[in-house]
């Protein structure tokens, strides 16, 4: 019985083991990747969790980058994170003045909800991102203006 309870506690600790990074955004790589400089002058590449923005050479790629820049560039942000991706980037939710920048990119039609990694998100974030994309599609906002939007994961496959 004690082993079972300990196993459950370890499991829940691992899925809620999020840390927070605070710093100023000093770079925008694209519509879902930024660079944050913390108070100790350490730079971190941050990949916005739960979304996938168009690639730079893809339609809406530069527009998506500009949108993210308008949201966060030179602003102090909090990044709630719990992992790094295979490229060494910290993956997390970026908050600027209490606003979820990841969600805002999806609302603006500047990124897709990245369902492939949805299990890494809190349930409420999953629902928010899903509804934001549905609304952007319905209202034909941003990359949803035309019928020819290509998801970044499909674009990357054809670019290889």
Question: Which residues does each predicted region cover?
Answer:
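Small beta-barrel nucleic-acid-binding modules, primarily SNase/OB-fold domains
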Residues: 2-5, 14-160
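Small beta-barrel nucleic-acid-binding modules, principally OB-folds
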Residues: 10-12
